[in-house]
């Protein structure tokens, strides 16, 4: 049904006699939600026509694709793009420009991590959704998809020389890998 979308794999999840199939696609440069919906519907209709015993009904999405909402599944498997940003801040730069040290930043990061754990937060990053929203709006994307992209995991490491390594990972968001579950 599309020249841009390619089926990567189909995952199966069972609950009693019910089955959820999660069709995973690559979609080129498109976010691809409409593309994968049409392709998946076509595949499901074909399966139903095959007369598979027990297959009486299918529904597209059924909340397993977790469109426009965060989910642990999308954190682990990625829906859309997975983005990783890394930087090593030199000790001299932190001292001269930021008026702090890698040790002070690392200590604060530990407090922030513990606060995230204590509160039951889903991630340990501060407000990734603000920047993502601005990018989505500027690029004409559906701002409601920010809920999938607002989860961010950060990691900091104090280096032996006083430099500070920092990474931020946004595990899911609109982009060239999309999925639809049924």
Describe each region flagged by the PLM.
Residues 13-23:
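Short, conserved phosphate-binding/catalytic loop or strand-edge motifs used
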Residues 25-181:
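Glycine-rich anion/phosphate-binding loop at the beta-strand->alpha-helix junction
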């Amino acid at each position: 049904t599309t020249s841009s979308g390619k089926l990567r794999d189909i995952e199966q999840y069972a609950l009693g006699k019910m089955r959820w199939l999660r069709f995973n696609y690559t979609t080129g440069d498109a976010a691809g939600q409409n593309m994968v919906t049409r392709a998946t519907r076509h595949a499901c209709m074909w399966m139903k026509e095959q007369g598979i015993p027990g297959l009486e009904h299918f529904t597209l999405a059924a909340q397993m694709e977790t469109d426009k909402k965060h989910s642990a599944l999308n954190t682990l498997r990625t829906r859309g793009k997975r983005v990783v940003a890394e930087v090593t801040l030199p000790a001299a730069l932190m001292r001269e420009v930021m008026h702090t040290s890698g040790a002070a930043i690392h200590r604060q990061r530990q407090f922030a991590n513990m606060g995230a754990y204590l509160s039951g937060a889903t991630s340990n990053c501060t407000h990734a959704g603000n920047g993502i929203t601005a990018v989505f709006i500027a690029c004409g994307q559906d701002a409601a998809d920010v809920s999938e992209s607002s989860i961010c995991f950060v990691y900091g490491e104090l280096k032996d020389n006083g430099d500070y390594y920092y990474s931020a990972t946004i595990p899911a968001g609109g982009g060239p890998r999309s999925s639809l579950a049924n």
